[in-house]
Amino acid sequence: MKEILHEDLVVVRSVCNIFCLRLNMPIIERYSAIKNGGIVFTGNTLGLSKAANVASPGVLGSIGAFISLDTSLQVSTFPAGTTLDYTKNGSAAVLNLPAGSTVLYAELVWGGLFRSSANNISALLDNPVEFITPSGSNSIAPDVSTKQNFNITEEGVTLGFYVRTANVTTLVKNAMNGTYSTGKVPALIEAIDARTSETNHA
């Protein structure tokens, strides 16, 4: 997900994920300016909903497969372009800024489930992710000053989620409009619903 400024008057003070208020997470100022401009968000999911206790398509509040940009990969009866391997996940979105726009600041934000009742991949959370712009592929390390890990308890199961961010202003300024994708995002997938209390995202 990128945050980009263009046209109309705005004041940008912080970047925060939706869990900040619930979990009393700190709001960290990433960019501050008073400019004629606007804010644009673009992004996509990395996970597809699953059926009960299997890695198959369904409508539970948990993911059963990652999206992959490699359409030769496929998980069970999920569509082509799916994987269980986080190093092969990836998702794309199109950025379309108005003509004449100038990018003042752009931030990449990613996250997912890192702890279930059976597994914990916290050692992988600071690994670089792959960020592909219209100009090419880039390895992006998370900014240590904004990293967030947090635990919640649902139905007696303690789950761990994380958020990482990185300043990608130069990359977006150079590439501007087109298709952007992010991949190799560490996250857990659990086929057994009790391990996540049907609560999972990436």
Language-model segments: which ranges?
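Cationic, amphipathic, low-complexity alpha-helical segments enriched
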Residues: M1-L23
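Disulfide-rich extracellular domains of secreted proteins
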Residues: C16-A202
